[in-house]
Design a protein with these regions (language model features):
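OB-fold ssDNA-binding interfaces and closely related basic DNA-contact patches used
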Residues: 4, 9-62
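Short, compact, well-ordered microdomains
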Residues: 88-134
Length: 134
């Protein structure tokens, strides 16, 4: 069995038990040379305010799945399908480089400042990202 840890109300940690057979039917995971003891997968959705693509990364270690980081950030502008600003302020730089090398994301050369951070716009390989889910 696997357990997903999440915060149902923003403060209270909850666990949900999921069978291994159910997880393996859904998708696959990837590993990085940086974090050899973790497996990763993606979560996708859309931001309600702009309709832009949201991508989150979850990690699995010792049968526990938990949120690792938000790959994307929602800035106040609508983007085309498969485009997203990458959260370079909170996501691990080495992980972002790995995702780029593996073809999950590709830089466009466009950036957008927001507060004290300049976010790069990336093209998302949504087909490939969609294969890697818990």
């Amino acid at each position: 069995m696997f357990y997903i840890t999440y915060k149902s109300d923003g403060t209270t940690a909850c666990k949900k038990q999921i069978s291994l057979s159910r997880l393996t039917e859904v998708g696959k995971t990837f590993k990085t040379p940086i974090y050899k003891n973790l497996e990763f997968a993606f979560t996708t959705s859309t931001y309600s305010t702009t309709g832009n693509t949201y991508v989150g990364i979850h990690s699995k270690k010792n049968d526990y799945i938990e949120p690792y980081c938000n790959l994307t950030v929602n800035l106040d502008m609508q983007l085309g399908k498969g485009l997203a600003f990458i959260d370079v302020n909170n996501a691990d730089r080495d992980l972002l480089l790995f995702l780029e090398e593996q073809g999950f994301i590709a830089p466009t050369g466009v950036t957008m400042p927001s507060e004290f951070v300049v976010y790069p716009l990336y093209r998302l390989n949504l087909n490939k990202i969609g294969e890697y889910k818990f």
